[in-house]
Each structure stands twice: as C-alpha cells, then as structure tokens.
C-alpha cells in the first residue's frame, strides 16, 4: 500500500498557497472519520488500518499547515528532493541570521518582553515575504533551485520563530 499524496488526502491540488482555515476544517472532518476510537469494536486488522490512516492524516496535516514543511514537500513530490542537512550559502542571509540571533540574545538578557513582541512582528513580516517569494517562484517553471534556497531560509525563520515563542513564554511567566 503506497502512501497517498498529502494534498490528495484533503482533495487539494498541489500548491503552495493554501487556505489554512479550510485545511483545518477538512482535517477535523477527516480525523473524525478515521479516528481509531471509532474502530474499537472492529477487527484487529481494521483497527491497525484506522491507526495507520489517522497517523498518515496527522502527518499530512502537519506538513501542509507549516509553510517550510509544505515547501519542502512540494519540492520533493516534484522530483527535487532536498537533503535535510544542507546549509544556506548566501552571505547576506547568513549575516542577517547572525544579526537576528544577536538581537534575540540581547532581548533575552534584558528580559524585554515588549522588544520580543516587536521582534516577533518583524520576523513574521520576513516570513510572509519569504512565503510570497516562494509561492511566486514555485508558480514559475524553471525556478526550482531558487525555490530550494527560499525553502531553506523559510526553515531557518521557522526555527527562529519557535525560539522567539519559547523566549516569550519564559519572559511571560
């Protein structure tokens, strides 16, 4: 049994631009249908299949709702598999990374919750710009190398956003 395309599970065409609210609604509908508890009285085989379907659905949803994971997945299903551990070779972006990290470290040292909020807004704007850039080059034939570079940047910003949320939680306690 092959793994169905994540998009096909949700009756969607592969695209970077998604309506995340509709995706979440469809996920909840499908999750109710395949939830393992619904198969408590079924045969062991049917229970296992329900569990596998539920796990596949959860994985597909987590992938599609995350812009960097969705970008990586699109590249993979288009035959442009991206190794997990390749670094970004863009000096300007590397410098920007260092500046963001230093700024975040200063905000942590100063326990500046308001500053973290401002940083978070700037980071979100940078993520939105990257997402739009990726969507634009994804729609343009022959731009897969650029799409890969943008996806790597998206992954970095996503990781940085997670660190910002964690810092925000620590400072908010």
Curated annotation (Swiss-Prot):
What's the protein here called?
A: Co-chaperone protein HscB homolog
Protein task: Co-chaperone involved in the maturation of iron-sulfur cluster-containing proteins. Seems to help targeting proteins to be folded toward HscA.
- Keywords on record: Chaperone
State the similarity comment. Belongs to the HscB family.
Lineage of the organism:
Bacteria, Pseudomonadati, Pseudomonadota, Gammaproteobacteria, Pseudomonadales
All residue ranges annotated as the J domain in the record: 5-77
Q: Which residues form the signal peptide?
A: none
- Known InterPro entries for this protein? DnaJ_domain, HscB, HscB_C_sf, HscB_oligo_C, J_dom_sf
